Swiss-Prot record:
Described purpose of this protein according to its UniProt entry: Involved in nucleolar processing of pre-18S ribosomal RNA and ribosome assembly.
GO biological process assignments: ribosomal small subunit biogenesis; rRNA processing; translation
Keyword set includes Zinc: no
GO MF annotation terms: rRNA binding; structural constituent of ribosome
Protein name per its UniProtKB record: Small ribosomal subunit protein uS4
Disulfide bonds: none
Alphabetical list of Gene3D superfamilies matching this protein: RNA-binding S4 domain
Amino acid sequence: MAGKKGSKRASTPRDPFEKERLIREAQLVGVYGLKNKHELWVMEKIFAKDKERARILLTSTNPEDIPINGRSLLRRLMKYGILGGIDLCDKQEVVNGLNKVLDLTINHYLERRLQFRVFAAGLAKSVHHARLLIGGRCISIKDQIVDVPGFMVRADKEPLIEYNPYSRYGDKGKKKAEAKVGEE
């Protein structure tokens, strides 16, 4: 029995040949080392949903919406390190935080991908090299191998990004390779 059909992860642009958008997308794909524009469109959909949610909350007439739903949105963005330094107990700071969400750009979201975090941590020479390391299962987050370049890294897990200990870059993998050379 087949399962339910999931919702689309990405939405395609309305005008496929808009020159400014094509140039901007090509630059983002190159800077962040994305495989194709579909990966960019997935992140843009997440970004647009968060922005729309913040806009709806700010214009809501129900006074209970901002404290409850606004805090949950801001808590999630703070968890991923997209926003920071917001006191969720103060209602005015929550409103200010929702205004900050409207000021975010797609770059804030793309920088939280594992591929860019590996490059930013200095484990790879470029974002393209980072993608190869991740696909080759050479990167782990706290002893958990992650082989998805689009994995969104939480702010508390960022310092735990390291080489997989059993890969050729990790400590145990290097010892294993040295033992093989010694046997020959």
